Amino acid sequence: GFVKILHSLIIISLLLMMTSGLQIYNATPVFGGKTGWQVPKWATLGGWLAGGRDWHFTVMWVFSFTLLIYGIYIFLTQRWKKRFFSQQDLKALQVGQNPKRRTYAWHRLIYTSIIPILILAIGSGLAMYQPAQLHWLSRLFINWQTLRTIHFLTVPISLLFILVHLIMGIRAGGLRLTRSMFRF
């Protein structure tokens, strides 16, 4: 129950942040300025720039704290030993004959690889949210446009992760397992 609730909160908050982020993008597009490609209204949340920012910055806290709680939970229960990519997984991918073991190794590799992307998304988001207070963080990204571009690029990477995570979950346990993640 607890992990399923966290899982659902992460997915819902990600979708809300993506759609509100697209509203922010429409106000000042990252690629091509104000004449750049515009996201269709139906794919955005917030109605205008300030509304998009309100949604984005509110949900950002839900997302970040949910990830933090999940991280603490994984650490305290020592589930990280089974969740993250290890030497045994590398061996299974290189020479392993057991297809299920290889699938789980791929799953852990994908699961582990999203961590730096999420840190980058949160770090770049915080740098834009409070650039004066977190000037040291903002400076790590060289300039404002680079910061915005990096933050924006974490979205398709996260979407790709969700898609691959979903497909691998279906391959490992079928639709029944995947559906069970959303039943409390």
Residue ranges and their predicted role:
Residues G1-F184:
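Membrane-embedded alpha-helical bundles that constitute the cytochrome b-like, heme-associated redox core
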